[in-house]
């Protein structure tokens, strides 16, 4: 019995030693979705009609947000936070690429979407596909969106997933950041990814 106990104890010590030697996993504030089987590709036209794909942004940490220009709160808050994070990161802010995908291509014309995106930074890439293309992109990212009738005839708003998807500089999906997490938490996560976490 004593030999068995010693072996178990020795095995436990070996396991603890190996765990101590292995590299520390990054302590993200957002939800770590590294290796997810979704959000692996994005291919939509920008506001000039040029096809854009995620791979062209390799070398940067990419933050993808699905929203719309007439969104009263979540969208402008999220985009303003991303802009603030970029500023807070100083020179490293240039290593962050924000992408806005409209879920309301009906009202978000290229001109309106382009002006809206630019109000949160000249480097924000705004993507606008057909409704079918938008649905396909949303499905790939497991993003929900739906038109909700407004209070007046013909008016509507959009319900949509309120969070951002973050890719590392190698183009791998890494994080889902919920709306309302705050600038400090997002800055911490993006800083770790820029550093190669």
Language model features with spans:
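Short loop/turn microsegments at loop-to-beta-strand junctions
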Residues: 39-40, 62, 161-163
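Thiol/disulfide oxidoreductase modules built on the thioredoxin-like
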Residues: 133-189
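Short active-site neighborhood of thiol/selenol oxidoreductases, capturing the structured segment around
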Residues: 55-74
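N-terminal export leaders
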Residues: 6-10
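Structural microenvironment flanking redox-active thiols in thiol-disulfide oxidoreductases
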Residues: 77-137
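C-terminal motif of bacterial Sec signal peptides marking the signal peptidase cleavage site
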Residues: 19-20
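Hydrophobic "lid"/C-terminal helical patch
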Residues: 13, 190
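N-terminal "domain-start" segment that seeds a small globular fold
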Residues: 24-55, 80
């Amino acid at each position: 019995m004593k030999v068995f106990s010693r072996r178990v104890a020795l095995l436990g010590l070996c396991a603890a030693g190996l765990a101590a030697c292995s590299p520390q996993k990054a302590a993200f504030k957002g939800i770590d979705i590294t290796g997810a089987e979704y959000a692996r590709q994005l291919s939509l036209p920008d506001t000039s009609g040029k096809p854009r794909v995620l791979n062209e942004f390799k070398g940067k940490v990419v933050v993808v947000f699905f929203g719309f220009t007439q969104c009263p709160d979540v969208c402008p808050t999220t985009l303003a936070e991303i802009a603030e994070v970029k500023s807070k990161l100083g020179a490293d802010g240039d290593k962050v690429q924000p992408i806005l995908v409209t879920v309301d291509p009906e009202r978000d014309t290229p001109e309106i979407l382009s002006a809206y995106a630019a109000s949160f930074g000249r480097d924000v890439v705004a993507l606008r596909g057909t409704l079918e293309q938008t649905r396909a992109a949303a499905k790939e990212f497991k993003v929900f969106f739906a038109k909700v009738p407004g209070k007046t005839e013909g008016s509507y708003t959009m319900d949509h997933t309120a969070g951002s998807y973050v890719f590392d500089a190698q183009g791998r999906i890494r994080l889902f950041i919920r709306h309302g997490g705050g600038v400090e938490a997002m800055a911490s996560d993006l800083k770790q990814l820029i550093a190669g976490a």
